[in-house]
From Swiss-Prot:
Pfam families: Ribosomal_L13 (PF00572). Part of the 50S ribosomal subunit. This is Large ribosomal subunit protein uL13. It comes from Mycobacterium leprae (strain TN). GO terms for cellular component: cytosolic large ribosomal subunit. Keywords: Ribonucleoprotein, Ribosomal protein. The gene is rplM.
Length: 147
């Protein structure tokens, strides 16, 4: 019997909604990246996008462990001399908490040809509401020890 190799249309995509309230950012990102890639499915193949859609709500209530809120820096550069800009994670969480969570999840995805396609399946919202109720997302519970 030959080995089964899934093709692009062979797998069905589900929608999951993850509540990020009091969930540690790294653990949330690892679980979301696993769902996005489809590694939880028996038909996983690294060369086929067989992952599920993931909606993360309450990104503004995610927990960042340790003193990273004050000390972890995020850098960006304008391309001009002296154009290095840096902010702490705490400053970014006040303005754009959805971007912080999205960057953490995207950082745990592979950097290859499928990465953009996988990133399109991720939706992050700062509040408790999302516009994807028509897709009937299934709540996904992250099991963790209380903070």
């Amino acid at each position: 019997m030959p080995t089964y190799a899934p093709k692009a249309g062979d797998t069905t995509c589900s929608w999951y909604v993850i509540d990020a309230t009091d969930v540690v950012l790294g653990r949330l990102a690892a679980v979301a990246a696993t769902l996005l890639r489809g590694k939880h499915k028996p038909t996983f193949a690294p060369n086929v996008d067989g992952g599920d859609f993931v909606i993360v709500i309450n990104a503004d209530k995610v927990a960042i462990s340790g003193d990273k809120v004050q000390h972890k820096m995020v850098y960006r550069h304008s391309g001009y001399p002296g154009g290095l800009r840096k902010r702490t994670i705490g400053e970014l969480m006040q303005k754009h908490p959805d971007r912080v969570v999205e960057k953490a999840i995207v950082g745990m995805l592979p950097k290859n040809k499928l990465s953009r396609q996988i990133q399109r399946k991720l939706r992050v919202y700062a509040g408790p509401d999302h516009p994807h109720s028509a897709q009937q997302p299934v709540p996904f519970e992250i099991k963790q020890v209380a903070q």
